[in-house]
UniProtKB/Swiss-Prot annotation:
GO cellular component: cytosol
Keywords: Cell cycle, Cell division, Cell shape, Cell wall biogenesis/degradation, Cytoplasm, FAD, Flavoprotein, NADP, Oxidoreductase, Peptidoglycan synthesis
Keyword NADP attributed: yes
Name of the featured protein: UDP-N-acetylenolpyruvoylglucosamine reductase
Essential cofactor(s): FAD
Annotated active site: 172, 222, 292
Domain of life: Bacteria
Region forming the signal peptide: none
Family indicated by similarity: Belongs to the MurB family.
Compartments where located: Cytoplasm
Length: 300
């Protein structure tokens, strides 16, 4: 089976060839995927995973690409974007959301059912799959605190469930980062609450986010992990790096923990800014900043 037959092999799945990933990433940067597929359900994911397993074609899975930098050289092989898998089901206090569902939309559905526990995620721009992959969190909350179980597909096509404990959640970490398993859906165990109180908390957190973060510009969200005993944004601010620019990428003047695309920036611009920030903070404070953002793809 030849790779060049991928589109004709799966006529029922939308697949694009040499598709620029800048059209899909929140940074508006990133080179082309050799192939970009848009599965709409688990059966289509299964077909593509089986094909890659059998042929050895490289497979990369992405969601909303909100905390992701794709290098300008693009991505080899097949990229599967799961954002068309958006089903959300509510049963009592349990909410099951497909990998491509918007985390923000899931928090709204929970609110509409008077379910509390997901308020912290009201403004997190990623998909459910991405949130599970990196144990996304904000304002003192973490995804791991409300996950009951996760359905995953291994790279050989096997599907099974992982409990919260088996997911091995940590700070911006989960078991699927190392295993390569693909998140298909996640079930959240929530509690009945007061809808007005839930709404008020979500609105408060969204207002705080809008006041402090550069939501009006393309970015990849929080770039660096929180170093033990420090705040990355404060270190970057204290190093005098706010406003530092390379090409079209800039350390946000609104929040030092963000790098924004101010003028047709490239992934290389982003990576240059990240490297300069890391070097400067290390030099001035002796603190090594680790990236939270996922960086993938070929060198340009």
């Amino acid at each position: 089976m030849q790779m060049e037959n991928l589109i004709t092999t799966f006529p029922e799945i939308e697949i694009k060839e040499h598709e620029p990933l800048a059209h899909y990433t929140n940074t508006k940067t990133g080179g082309p995927a050799d192939w970009l597929a848009f599965p709409v359900d688990v059966a289509q994911v299964q077909q593509l995973v089986d094909y890659c397993h059998q042929t050895g074609l490289a497979l990369t899975v992405i969601g909303n690409a909100s905390n992701l930098i794709v290098r300008d050289g693009g991505i080899e092989g097949l990229v599967m974007i799961l954002t068309r898998m958006q089903t959300v089901k509510v049963e009592g206090t349990m909410v099951t959301a497909a990998a491509g569902a918007s985390y923000i939309e899931v928090t709204k559905i929970a609110r509409d059912h008077s379910l509390t526990g997901l308020e912290f995620a009201a403004g997190i721009p990623g998909s459910i799959g991405g949130a599970i992959f990196m144990n996304a969190g904000a304002y003192g909350g973490e995804t791991k605190t409300v996950v009951d179980h996760v359905t995953v597909m291994e790279r050989d096509g096997q599907i099974h469930q992982l409990s919260n404990e088996e997911m091995d959640f940590g700070y911006r970490h989960s078991a699927v980062q190392a295993s390569g398993a693909i998140v298909l859906d996640a079930t959240f165990a929530l509690k009945l609450g007061d809808q007005n109180a839930i709404t008020a908390q979500m609105e408060d957190l969204n207002a705080r986010r809008a006041a402090k973060q550069p939501l009006e510009l393309p970015s990849c969200g929080s770039v660096f992990k929180r170093p033990t005993g420090y705040f990355a944004g404060k270190l970057i601010h204290d190093a005098g790096l706010q406003g530092y620019t390379s090409g079209g990428a800039q350390v946000s003047t609104k929040h030092a923990g963000f790098i924004v695309n101010v003028n047709h920036g490239t992934a290389t611009d982003y990576l240059n800014v990240i490297h300069h920030v890391q070097e400067t903070v290390q030099e001035k404070f002796g603190v090594q900043l680790e990236t939270e953002v996922r960086i993938i793809g070929r060198q340009s």
